[in-house]
Amino acid sequence: MNRMVPLAILALAILAFATLMLVIAPAIQIRSEAPTPGLKPYTAQQLRGRTQYVAQGCIYCHSQQPRSIDQAPDAERGWGRASVASDYAYDRPHLLGTMRTGPDLFNVGARLPSRGWHLTHLYQPRAIFGWSIMPAYPYLFERKEHAEPGDVVIILPADRAPKKGVIVAKREALDLVAYLQSLDHTFPAPTRAVRDDGYAEKGEPR
Amino acid sequence: MTLTIGLLLGLSFFASLLALAFLIWAVNNRQLTITQHDAYTIFTEGEAGHPDDATTEGSQDEGGAARAHHFDTERAGIDAISRPAVVTLISSGIAWLAIGSIFGLIASLKLHWPDWLVGEAWLTFGRVRTLHLNMVIYGWLSMTGIGVAMWVAPRIFHTALRYPKLPIIGAILWNVGVAAGAIAIASGWNDGQEWLEIPWQIDILIAIAGSFFVLPLLATAARRHVKHIYVTGWYYIAALCWFPILFFIANIPYIYSGVQEATVNWWFAHNVLGLWLTPLGVGAAYYFIPKIIGKPIYSYSLSLLGFWALALFYSQVGIHHLIGGPVPTWVVTLSIVHSVMMFVPVIAVAINHHVTVARNLWALKASVPLRFISLGAVMYTLASFQGSIEALRSVNSVTHFTQYTVAHAHLGAYGFVSFVMFGAVYHMLPRITGRSWPWPSMIPAHFWLVVVGFAIYFIGLTIGGVLQGFAMLDVARPFSDSVQVVLPYLEIRSLGGAVMVVGHLIFAAHFLAALIQRDAQAPAAQPHDTRSAVST
Amino acid sequence: MESFEPYEEFKPIPLPVLIIAVALALWGVFTLLDNGKAVTVGRAERSDQIADQHANRQNGAELFVSRCATCHQPNGSGVEGAIPPLASSPFLKASPEVAMHILLNGIDGPIRVGDATFEGHMPSFASVLSDADIVRLVTHVRGTFADRHDLLTEGDVATARLLAGRRGAWQGGQEIAARLDASLGPQPPMSSATQAAIDPIAQKLVSQGNGQTWACASCHGMRGQGSASVPRLAGLPAAYIAKQLGDYVTGKRRNETMQLVARTLKPQDMRRIGDYYSVMRAPSNARASLGGDLVRGERLVLDGDWARGLPSCVSCHGPSTFGVAPSFPALSAQHPEYTAAQLTAWVSGTRDNSTGRLMNGIAARLNDADRRAVADYLATLPPVPAPATRGRTNGK
């Protein structure tokens, strides 16, 4: 350990090896997967909504990767079947998430399909769930005296409604909800799909 | 495909094991030409055996600082060259700590006061939390870590810092980059991946700034005045080679997508901790612990094992963040196995650090910086053990997606790296300014505030996270249970966090006072002979 | 100052560290070797799920026993006055497309078989049987009961399936004869009495809401078919739906969203919505998705498990779990996430409104695997056909 260049070269070689294993090899395997049959590319509006999802930092409380029923009861909570690599073929950036301060959202479009519900919930989550700790997003909405043609007026319980006028959704909110509604992966996963099967129940497949 | 992957997988792990076995054989058969004597590299002649500390109560008297400096005559010249760069970097780092931890506290409070500060987009939880992370990682820890390295590296290499102006330019650019990144995040423009939020356009600036740090340090190492590279130097050289590559590869735009991008994301994010912050922290601890105590580390051969095993195993643990996710089984298993193998380097480093301190417990009483640093070293051991256990599939099922992970991340980045940096700054600044700290009683105050605050933070959030995880795994309990059960612990976390922030503000104010004090009075300790130190 | 401690010049790596390293390495090798097996099991589970969704492992005779014999009887004799016989049925003697179209769409109207007229309430099996299943089943049934052996192809079924989703059930034998095969002979006309009158007020409530809450259809779908944890409402008993809405208000049944909705509804609204959904027909969009064991699920649904004190589902919810008005809802074609969530809700107490609190005890005796098995199996059953009492609950 008296020479710097061999030290640096060895250190870099180890990192190169790690990069091969963790970046390049998985890339080759995942890229060879075709999108899951039934998966649709995002529309322009859904993509704008996805940008909102990133900008507001939804990812820090919501995952998009239901676990297998062998590991956790995600499917029974309505969060959907265990996701596989090819379900994310159109995702850029990936939004897998690592926290579940709120529920997983990979199938929120299937289990909560109502646009009106989502708008209310974004404006004030505690209007629906008293226990919720999700931030309210009033800045995605505006208050108007009267709704104009084309405005989407949100439904609020009497104790949350403004004293005067109506609350209408801004375009950002409508886009975000369009993205959430698009999160519906209720089609089956291919048999050979790629995912972490490390929790698959040991023993004979039934 | 299965066969090839299985083969690749096996080969990879066997390669690591083989390298480890070879290393152990080489160390035990003295094939590597290092000896315990090399551990004395950090001392000047006659210095070993004497504690070196300028913050102890005993040294606050008139002769204290002078006595410490008595052993640093040669280095005083070295220190003077790196002083402007070190001061710039560390003061920037501390500024980011103050701002970043306030954002952390706001984010923490918002989790249990969800209707607080919701009117403005930039104050929403998702952005405030992200500002906190980026400020403390890229602002506080990275800049302070580099600043400490700028001060330590010339000392272990027995020569002055090369290109000492470059780091100052680098620090300015880096500050601009982190600030621009923060503004981008606050305004809703980010790259969408954890730890990689700063837009890649701004990352270019940060990368350029980084090269202004790497170049002087590597040049200094290359032209050292001592044959042996002290263990701290291994960590620094390796980290300086690793981080630019990590940062560059992970930030390449447009080429990644979907789950494949997620593997790049976590390969990067964990390596920021493992191959960047950890070497900066462990390297600093390897210097300061023996330096303050005045005795070499316990076993120099163990430090070799600790270093190379860290490189071999830490570099492949990242995918344990995606356990149970939509990534190939083999890459998850590979990361789990490597995570568990991390016990080896951590035990090696732990023996070295803790035995050295345990044999000299008197020094803990005498030196607050040593208290910070050796407590930081203990937290490194704990955080690493915890991380290895957390990577086990059975444990991960409970802790993944919960606040437990947040507590763990803070044990590593705060309990370990930040504590080491606190201690390093307390040790270094009197030597940089040539004066004692102006308010010595504020140092233990800072120590106890962050220790107590962090204990509240960590214990509370860990318990809360486990309860949250069990609630989520129990299908008979609605999801709302997992939210309600963790809520009191989020409040406890805010309490602990607030105490920590008070500690940080005291630290920042004290640091500022120490700097202003220097400007008010002419520096007392001018280098005796600068030329002899820099001549090559 | 402390005195200088003597250090050895050289220390080998301590033995305990070596032992730990070797032990961890062995564990690592073992774990990696285990990896391949996990992938095999995972694939088998996914392939089972796909197979479950298409039930394509049964031959024609087995399909007949599991899907048809409950009503049409194992010997195809039917039930006098209620279920038409298959033996010598003109519908089977006709071209194979007739049986295929009936299986895909179901029948909702009177048909004549031999000398008897039956009020037809056959469910659609489109969601239950794959193209190949239908070919096997039609071939078996026509060969066995009508001695006809001309073949149907999977392509024919696939083409017909595209239309089936759009057109709904056949409105009695007359429509089948007119559209598919005139050789069926004279068939009874659709009587206007069975034609449900659509309640415009209910329709507005369902599709647009009442201005104070979200429209029912925005979650439950325009055809009341639901998805994932949103239940299918089409074909549930009217009184059952109205009671649930009332129970949300009183808190006997808890669900934050539905409690908000129900509080905005007047009792007469609740009855109107119940009536509206009770006569609604929608193809099934449910499928087994919890990884439950369908064989076990079928046994629990049809026979129960008396060793564990579990009665069969059909004993209360009626044959084929099509429901028994007013109190027992249809379970067939319900989304398994919803069914499973209700079964856990009976245990946790967030739902406590079943007749005689029967469900509390039953649900408590189901373990995780059984709950998933039952929920998944119910999802594979055909949706409830037209209720015999339709139109009457409107009170007109």
What are these regions (language model features)?
Chain A
Residues C61, W131-A136, F187-D196:
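Surface-exposed patches in mature extracellular/periplasmic domains of secreted proteins
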